A protein has these predicted regions:
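Outer-membrane beta-barrel translocator/receptor signature
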Residues: 77-81, 87-142, 153
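Surface-exposed extracellular loop regions of Gram-negative outer-membrane beta-barrel proteins
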Residues: 111-131, 250-253, 268-302, 438-439, ...
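Flexible loop and strand-edge segments within Gram-negative outer membrane beta-barrel domains
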Residues: 131-143, 156-210, 214-230
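Short sequence motifs at beta-strands and strand-loop junctions characteristic
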Residues: 89, 102-104, 134-138, 185-193, ...
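Bacterial Sec-dependent N-terminal signal peptides
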Residues: 1-24, 329, 484, 558, ...
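Exposed, low-structure sequence patches enriched in small/polar residues
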Residues: 97-98, 287, 291-568
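N-terminal periplasmic/intermembrane-space "pro-region" immediately following the signal or transit peptide
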Residues: 19-87
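Outer-membrane beta-barrel transmembrane domain signature of Gram-negative proteins
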Residues: 189-200, 214-287
Length: 568
């Protein structure tokens, strides 16, 4: 009976994948069984950079009682990134409906468990966030997921669709001189679509051998430009000995196939294989993961390979943790690397306002990071406080940088072009997390960056001219983050969230232009009417700052959102 169910499941997946598309998050299981506690959410604040779904493992939440996993530390805080709604899978409630509206923005969130049996669950979810006006931005998502639990494994299938709509509203901004031109409505706009489907299985038995397998399809669609098809396959297996020693292998295959709507465009289909053999040692106070990523890309590039259109490069995947003083002092270090395939999705994820034609023909595969390492220690001076201090170094071959193009001496930003540059980056930073009796939560973070300088190549690859840079471009020199949540009583809760980013420069018409610091101050509050109904109010960017996100593109000003959250 179990084999029969598996065969039916596979046939259903193939028929769907041939006509639709999918999300490619490995081992991702979404559920709508959630605990909707009165928490403050940043539902209305749209991100200023596209937030496409990628193949990555979500970081675990900080747990003060165990405190055994290093905090995930990004190389910079993402400016004005929207906070996502968080859920805890505990409550038997079947769904949630959340909506809000402001003077220039709207928000909608829906999740419902259509069917639930002892071993099977079917979930439906959707969301929509929009900001209106000449700097319009709309992001929508609709998805479905099916999970079935067998005796010794779980099987899942999900399908999802995304849409991003935005306008090209860029204007020149020069320090305190204000906006120069183009005060009317922009005439250019763009829709980006993504559809995806995944099917996978994961072992759940208590034996020494564990495995998982997933195959997925994803289509990224830029109308009138191209359709980027990706087939993603993942397999891993590991064997545990004596509960301390683990040996295994991870295998990932990525195939990218293009359909272009412009016959004069030259696009190379690309294929990537990654194999990571690894060894893990687990002890009460020590954890070690030692692996080597062996990457082979076919389509373009050379790197360590002498064969045309084939790129080969190894990189480390090492993680080390040492609980030195019974969860009071923790030392950790890691060193990772990768080689990636350039994609139109990744290209527009860097900056949605880039020239799409250039991205379609962006065949360079040199997205190679030989090493991205950091070392740090965590201190817990009291039970409810965690301090994390760290330093890091990264070296990127083919890091992306932009140039803003000004045509006919016009101060209006006509377009951006992307070029590649090898980049080194050093950083030091710290994070602090504190909570008091589930009443006060404090999260603070700050980073400082240093970039050893090189020579910046001309946009014209045939030109012998070089620009000697005095700084790196599109990167912050420092950033900071502060958030405080206060649960006043069982009904009321308030929060304050603040982000700061500074020391950024833009490359404009082969010259250097300083960007304004990003200062984003946000507050909000929520009132729980009863177990099922909450009302919330948010005020974002209440200083009404027009922060420079990119040269010529500024963030949204002050806006509010009044919303209702209903659980059923």
């Amino acid at each position: 009976m179990q084999i029969k169910f598996i065969l039916i499941f596979i046939v259903a997946f193939i028929s769907v994948a041939a006509t639709s598309a999918q999300d490619s998050v490995f081992n991702r299981v979404v559920t709508v069984e959630r605990d909707y506690q009165p928490e403050i959410q940043q539902a209305s604040k749209l991100p200023v950079t596209p937030n496409f779904i990628k193949e990555e493992v979500e970081p675990n939440s900080v747990v003060y009682s165990t405190y055994s996993i290093p905090l995930v530390v990004d190389f910079n805080l993402h400016p004005l990134q929207a906070a996502k709604t968080d859920f805890t899978p505990q409550t038997p409630l079947n769904g949630i409906l959340e909506g809000g509206i402001g003077h220039r923005n709207s928000h909608l969130l829906f999740g419902y468990q259509i069917a639930s049996a002892k071993h099977t669950a079917l979930n439906l979810y959707a969301s929509h966030d929009a900001y209106w006006g000449r700097d319009a931005l709309s992001q929508s998502l609709l998805g479905m997921q099916l999970v079935h639990h067998f005796r010794n494994m779980d099987m899942y299938f999900d399908v999802q669709g995304n849409n991003d709509y935005f306008t090209y509203y860029g204007k020149y901004f020069d320090g305190n001189q204000g906006l120069a031109i183009n005060i009317g409505e922009p005439v250019e706009h763009q829709n980006l679509w993504q559809v995806s489907a995944n099917m996978g299985l994961k072992s759940t038995h208590k034996g020494d051998v564990q495995y998982s397998f997933q195959v997925g399809y994803k289509a990224f669609i830029a109308p009138q430009y191209t359709v980027e098809n990706q087939i993603l396959t993942h397999f891993d297996i590991n064997w545990t000995s004596n509960k301390k020693h683990v040996a295994g292998i991870n295998i990932d295959v990525q195939n990218m196939l293009y359909n272009t709507l412009k016959p004069d465009s030259t696009i190379l289909n690309r294929h990537a294989l990654r194999i990571e053999p690894f060894y893990e040692y687990k002890h009460k106070s020590i954890r070690l993961h030692a692996g080597v990523n062996v990457d082979l890309n076919i389509g373009t590039g050379t790197l360590l390979s002498s064969v045309e259109n084939i790129a080969f490069a190894p990189s480390p995947n090492i993680e080390f943790e040492w609980n030195m003083m019974d969860n009071i002092f923790h030392l950790y270090a890691n060193a990772k690397g990768s080689i990636g395939i350039r994609s139109v999705e990744e290209y527009l994820g860097y900056n949605r306002y880039l020239n799409i034609n250039q991205g379609v023909a962006f065949n360079d595969i040199r997205a190679y990071t030989p090493v991205d390492a950091q070392v740090g220690f965590k201190i817990r001076p009291i039970k409810t406080m965690l301090i994390d201090i760290y330093g890091g170094y990264a070296y990127h071959i083919g890091a992306c940088h932009m140039e803003a193009i000004l045509q006919d001496n016009s101060p209006s930003v006509q377009e951006y072009k992307l070029w590649l540059h090898n980049e080194q980056q050093w950083k030091v930073g710290a994070q602090l997390h504190y909570h008091y009796k589930d009443i006060i939560d404090v999260n603070l973070a700050g980073n400082y960056y240093f970039y050893p300088l090189g020579r910046i190549p001309s946009m014209d690859p045939t030109s012998p001219n070089f620009l000697k840079a005095t700084t790196t471009f599109d990167r912050p020199q420092w950033d900071a983050y502060a958030r405080i949540d206060a649960h006043i009583d069982s009904k009321w809760s308030i929060y304050s969230e603040n982000q700061f980013v500074g020391g950024r420069w833009a490359y404009v018409a082969k010259s250097q232009q300083r960007l304004k610091p990003i200062i984003s101050l946000n507050i909000g509050g929520q009132y729980s009417i009863n177990k099922w109904l909450n009302v919330y109010l948010q005020l974002n960017n209440y200083l009404n700052r027009k922060n420079d996100i990119f040269y010529g593109y500024q963030s949204q000003g002050c806006h509010f959102l009044l919303g209702v959250k209903y659980k059923f």
